[in-house]
Amino acid sequence: MKGLAIFITSLFVTMSVSAQTGVETDSIDTSAFDKYLNEIVIVAKKPGTVVKTDRKVYTVNQDLMSKASSASEVLNHIPSVEVDIDGNVSMRGNDNVTILINGKPSAMMAGKTRADALSQLSAANIERIEVIDNPTSEYRAEGGGGIINIIMRTDTKQGFNGSILANAGSVGRYNAGVNLNYGIRNLNFYGGYTFRRDRYDRTVDDYRISPSDTITQTTYGLGRPVSHTFRLGMTANITSADMLSVSGNYNRRNFKRDEYVDSRTRDLNGIVSDSYHRDRDADAKENMWEGTLQYTHRYGNSNEISIGYLYSSESEDELNRYTTMRQDVETRNNETVWDADYIHNANLRWQHALTDNIRLTSGYEFEHLRAEQNYHVSDWDGTSFIPNTDESNDFTHLRMVNSLYANADMTFGLWRVNAGLRGEYTDIDNQLKSISESRRKHYFDLFPSARVSRHIGDDIELSTGYSMRINRPQGSDMNPFTERINPLSLEAGNPDLKPERINTADFGIRWLSNAGSLTANLFYRHISDGITEVSRYIDNGILLTTKENLQTSHNAGVELVWNMRVTDWLDINLNGTGYYNRINASRLGFGGNREMFSWSGLLNADFTPIKHGTVQLNARYHSATLVPQGKRDGDFQLNLGLKYDIPSINLALFASVTDLLDTYKLSYTLDTPALKQKVEKRRNPRIIYVGLSWNFGGGSRKQHHNVEYDEEM
């Protein structure tokens, strides 16, 4: 951190400290200047990735591609995190990941539309992303793979200030946004608006072999989503010890989809025995609402009590119009899908320092989730559409979770110990309204967690941790009614699914220096009753995909994260993960254990070849990974970002190219005695954006006594 400046009315003091990528700096003692200073403003460029004892923190503002990208694209640039072509998020090979917004659950991240929500959440509105591999008991126990906490942008500057962002992309993509902030005395108001227009081109090749025939399907899809996002918030320092914050956001998205499927079935002699062509014309309207209220009271030395409430809802109303030509016979049918999630969350948190070295955190959390899934089909009889009650259903999933937790953080010399326990009582009610049936489940679990760390000198830290977590089935996973994807593909849930339970342990070493940091972690994960997707043939070559519980699975490996400032003009972040995965699939009838070693690599490199100019490279490779019925093939992606700053007018120019080499795809192979299937999905290549951002307004930040990074650098 160079050019650190402290400004006063008649005195100017310049200080210099190090802020290399991934290095945590010590606090700066300013007591010698206290009688002269009214306000301290410390300016520095944030490091892109900081690896802490219990988490990785990724500063989105330092990712050049974030200026035009969505949250899902930025997540793919973070160590430990992977996002596939369908928007599914995983960590270290485990896709049971909990995603929080500002530390709280969100309906946008709770249901089947999570991938769509991430693709429409503008990365420019994100402050930072925290990746927590092995959370403590203070966090809700959901998410066996870990927690991703997305922290949205806010500002605390006095006066009126803001920023404007605009981007234009290839094949009709556009996005733009404005963020405003107004701070006056102890009040701060902020708001923003974001517009996104995207285009998704998809090609899917599906090749299946059964004992009696082969099926070849090719799907061409085009999606054109348009979204509008509004956000508004306020923070009020009522007194020096009391703070109230209120915030809300609304997102509306219209999504048009066109799809064409060509399918051919051949017998064992290679003769076409069946074929069809299917056209899909779909319109979807999505609405997402969210509001939060939080009150915090601070007392004593670092003690506080807070109470909060959150309401979050997401709904999708979709109309699908299908026309199918099969053996020279045309059929038409309409499918309407209503998919909605409603979340109420209330929390009480108490933090109290028992001594100078022992801090206790405890709390209560209540969460109520209502998930609705209504699927109605009507068939054309030549004159009108007639409801098809055999293929229509209404399903509601209700889930209440009551949680109590206590967590102690203790320091003994060079040792730090964190230990906690969380208890969660879960009540689930699955309502099959079409047949007036209700299925209830309830259970109680205890989730312990512990972490011990020790410093060796100023540069090395050792840590080890353990936690137990759970992954509860989503409502759609337990809906037993069948949804027809196409004439030869069906999907259905499993009402008998059990929650999966995960035990995770890790051991890590972290080394810090003025030039960078190196972190190495060994991890082990044991999963009981793991929830997995299974495909099986039923009658007449129709493939049914559902969810089932595995017996056990084991995952063990090592992860390395290296942050290094190589020269004044080159910063590098390297991440490598290798792990061994073993699955016991005997419960599913696929034989005994299946096992595989997988690895992945991630490179983020920042070049500054000229003053005010930055070039950023992002490259990721992932080898083949294990699934219960086969494997997912490896993939590679290379991205490029460019930025040029014009400091005199607070303007920055950007350009980015996603998938520069047109190599990104998703393919998997299933291989069982009854089913052999190869699927390959590709998206539109080389997404290109050019854009600009402008920061405006002045005003100073509210007084702080800690190092504060300036967002405008």
Per-segment meaning from a language model:
Residues G146, I150-N161, T203-D205, S227-L232, S315, D427-D429, D458-A505, Y524-T545, ...:
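Surface-exposed extracellular loop regions of Gram-negative outer-membrane beta-barrel proteins
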Residues A71, H77, P105-D133:
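Short acidic/polar hinge/loop motifs at secondary-structure boundaries
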Residues T218, N334, I343-N347, T389-S392, ...:
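Outer membrane beta-barrel strand-and-loop segments of large Gram-negative receptors
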Residues T21-L64, D84-D86, N94-N96, I132-N134:
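Short, acidic, small-residue-rich periplasmic hinge/interaction motif at the N-terminus
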Residues G172-D198, D213-E259, N287-W289, Q294-H297, ...:
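Transmembrane beta-barrel wall of Gram-negative outer-membrane proteins
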Residues E39, A71-V74, R114-A117, V131, ...:
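N-terminal periplasmic accessory domains that precede
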Residues R594-M713:
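Conserved C-terminal beta-signal and adjacent last beta-strands/turns
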